[in-house]
Swiss-Prot record:
Annotated keywords: Autocatalytic cleavage, DNA damage, DNA repair, DNA replication, DNA-binding, Hydrolase, Repressor, SOS response, Transcription, Transcription regulation
Record: active site: 120, 157
Gene for this chain: lexA
Site (Cleavage): 86-87
Entries under HAMAP family matching the protein: LexA
Organism placement in taxonomy: Bacteria, Pseudomonadati, Thermodesulfobacteriota, Desulfuromonadia, Desulfuromonadales
Catalytic activity: Hydrolysis of Ala-|-Gly bond in repressor LexA
Name assigned to this protein: LexA repressor
GO BP: DNA repair; DNA replication; negative regulation of DNA-templated transcription; proteolysis; SOS response
Signal sequence region: none
Gene3D superfamilies per record: Umud Fragment, subunit A, Winged helix-like DNA-binding domain superfamily/Winged helix DNA-binding domain
Family: Belongs to the peptidase S24 family.
């Protein structure tokens, strides 16, 4: 989503200030008067945009049915970087979208989201169509679930290190591990820190 326009920010600031000073939200009529809008439809368009941004919650059946959402309620917006295989590797494709995730999933560092295709990680509760939240890092510990690039294609698997050998293990007994035969064509992109089954597209 694009940033708020100056007028959209002014409307949000007015609502927030009114709630802070009066203890309740302004009505749509009051918002229209404050900004010189000629119709309530214009007000509703602004409220829809602010709600889509996760800044407000509305109750259309209440005259003053606006509530501000806190930062923790809004969650974190992370880039959806593409699709990753939980079967055989497929290419990660950049997609211009963001996903809102619970802030408890996101710690320090840079994070991104990938959509999972395939069922090789069902034993870890990651199924086809899920979204994995990934902390971007170039290293990982034995046993961690990682997103890795193998021959320039992305896959999500458990990382196993056996002496000098690297293996990518599925969490599905019907599938075989992937043995990394050429370390020069292998790179860890990050560690999976969360899974989202029902997500909100921002």
């Amino acid at each position: 989503m694009s940033p708020l326009t100056p007028k959209q920010k002014q409307v949000f600031d007015y609502i927030a200030r009114h709630i802070g000073e009066q203890g309740f939200a302004p009505s749509q009529q009051e918002i229209a008067r404050a900004f010189g809008f000629r119709s309530l439809g214009t007000v509703r368009n602004y409220l829809v945009r602010l709600e889509r941004e996760g800044l407000l919650e509305r109750n259309w059946n209440a005259r003053r049915g606006l509530q501000l959402r806190t930062a923790s309620e809004r969650g974190m917006k992370l880039p959806l970087a593409g699709t990753v295989a939980a079967g055989k590797p497929i290419e990660a494709i950049e997609i211009p979208d963001v996903i809102e995730v619970p802030p408890t999933m996101v710690g320090s560092g840079e994070h991104f989201v990938l959509r999972v295709a395939g069922d090789s990680m069902i034993g870890d509760g990651i199924i086809d169509g899920d979204y994995v939240v990934v902390r971007k890092q170039a290293t990982a510990e034995h046993g961690q679930t990682v997103v890795a690039l193998l021959d320039n294609e992305a896959t999500v698997k458990r990382l196993h290190r056996r002496n000098d050998r690297i293996e990518l293990h599925p969490a599905n007994p019907s599938m075989q591990p992937i043995v990394v035969t050429d370390p020069d064509n292998f790179r860890i992109e990050g560690v999976v820190v969360g899974v989202i089954r029902h997500y909100r597209s921002a």
